[in-house]
Regions:
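Glycine-rich phosphate-binding loop and adjacent beta-alpha segment
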Residues: 181-223
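Short helix-loop-beta connector
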Residues: 71-75, 98-104, 168-169
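Short, well-ordered loop/turn sites that connect or cap secondary structure elements
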Residues: 41-43, 99, 190
Length: 223
């Protein structure tokens, strides 16, 4: 399951059409070819990744299907670090965020599928990495298992106070997965020339009306 599924249920203008009522829920999938009607690109038994949806079997003309090597990694891996979450994290933080050694990187939803990978990539690149997560268990995971330098527990402390503690010199890159009040808090600590990677807004997915940033001026003065 992916948070994006919630957005795909809304009949609004987006980067992809909504899922039809009574239709198969859109989802990335990994499976094996059990029958092939003369498609030269695949053979019975091939392991493939595709947008097969939430179902046990699907029929495809082969478009959007890609072979994966199940000997190289377990099949679920092609839905995580070697799938959409991994690609989102990789290109988001490197191509959009343009991180460099010494940057301070703040990641919301740091214990999630994308955020957890973003932070590890940033650490490999020599950045100081701080996460934002909800609850002690998630924050411990972010620091002790993923190797982040620090974590703000938005459920049990002031978000702004936590960011100030962990990022006393400000933020060079903010990887935003949630929007809302956490985005508002992060904007206060942007350094001059900071970059924001807008990946998700999960805090807003169930809201009837969208709420914009309260401190938009921070984007102007720290451009």
């Amino acid at each position: 399951l992916d948070p994006a599924m919630r957005g795909w249920m809304n009949d609004t203008k987006s980067y992809i059409p909504p899922v039809e009522i009574n239709g198969v829920m859109r989802a990335g999938s990994v499976g094996k070819v059990i029958q092939n009607n003369n498609n030269p690109n695949f053979q019975v038994g091939d392991c493939v990744s595709s947008w097969g949806g939430v179902q046990q079997y699907c029929v495809s003309d082969g478009e959007g299907c890609f072979k994966v090597d199940e000997k190289a990694a377990s099949m679920p891996t092609f839905l995580s670090v070697l799938g959409m979450p991994g690609m989102t994290a990789y290109f988001g933080i490197l191509e959009v965020g343009k991180i460099k050694e010494g940057d301070t990187v703040l990641v919301s939803a740091a214990a999630g599928a994308v955020g957890s990978i973003v932070g590890q990539i940033a650490k490999i690149k020599g950045c100081k990495v701080v996460g934002i997560a909800g609850g002690k268990e998630k924050c411990d995971y972010v620091i002790n298992e993923l190797g982040f330098d620090g974590c703000v527990d938005y459920k049990n402390e002031s978000i702004k106070r936590g960011i100030k503690r962990e990022c006393p010199d400000g933020i060079d890159v903010y990887f935003d997965n949630v929007g809302g009040e956490i985005l508002d808090a992060a904007l206060v600590f942007l350094r001059m020339g900071a970059r924001i990677v807008v990946c998700g807004a999960i805090s807003q997915y169930n809201e009837m009306s969208a709420k914009g940033p309260d401190n938009y001026l921070s984007l102007l003065v720290n451009r």
